[in-house]
Amino acid sequence: MANALLMQTSSKPMPGLQSWPQLCRLQSVIERRFAFSRSLVGRALDTFGAQWADEFETLLSSLFEDEAALETAMKGYSAFAMDSMRHQRAFEKTREYPNKTYAEAAQAVYFNEAHMLREYLPGLLLSHFLWPHHYRQLQFFDMAFAAPLARAADKRFAEVGVGTGVYARRLLSCMPQAHGLGYDISPSSCQFATQHLAAAGVSGRFAMRLQDIVAQPMEPVPWLVCVEVLEHLEDPVAFLRVLRQAVAPSGKAFITAALNAAHADHIYLYRNAQEVWQHLDAAGFHVEQSFVAAAYAPSAPGVPVPLAAAFVVS
């Protein structure tokens, strides 16, 4: 993990970065305080080009008004990435996640306000643009889910496990007719996502609910998003069956899972995308499209690396 998500040690020239003032400010903060990540921005710009830069610039501009705010966010990202790296190194040795219950993970992470607002959520937010497999998943989301939603007459959607609000923002920003509901069990996630969507100017079309949809089922919707929730659960299939009931007849869902990705709150270990597919099938979903991306190349043959797996299902 160190060689791709955090410990970049060589700085590459970034011609044209001056076209994006916030990215320039972010790079300045990184060079000054977080030199181990100095090539993240340049590498992503080289890989994904102007579209990535435009999108990241828009997000940064709406949420972080000055370098001090960017530095605070980058501090959260650094802590998030370092913690992830430590867990991944341990996983590479044991090939298992530490044994923990959902209640233990929830208490340590989701209901830990200081950790969520200072590290976890800012780190996760920036990772959508600084980690290649996270951004590639956003691209797949745009193509395989957002595009058909944009053509649909009924643009109502729900997101279960809203987290930072990145995916909801993506839909609301590109579709003025879209309206959404967000569900999360973490008060901090609800707060962060609400503030994020307000800063983006789209909160008027999105209602956030602090609600466990297993204990209190949600109303079915034609379009449903659930990003990286399954690995946080003890019984993903039971949760997927609840999600299946939340998708209206003829509706579609975008469901993802993190594979071989050790984090403090990851409980269920998916080793490959086929295991997720089997769980989706067991819950009654039909897989229409799928996508898998690796975080980085393995350090040696057979060493597991984090993967992002996404599915469009009906």
Predicted regions and their residues:
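Conserved class I S-adenosyl-L-methionine
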Residues: 153-163
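Conserved SAM-binding loop of SAM-dependent methyltransferases across substrates and taxa
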Residues: 164-176
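Conserved SAM-binding motif I beta-strand of class I
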Residues: 179-184
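Conserved SAM/SAH-binding beta-strand->alpha-helix loop
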Residues: 186-188
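A short glycine-rich, Lys/Arg-flanked "PGG" loop and its adjoining helix->strand segment in the class I
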Residues: 238-249
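Conserved beta-strand signature within the Rossmann-like core of class I S-adenosyl-L-methionine
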Residues: 251-258
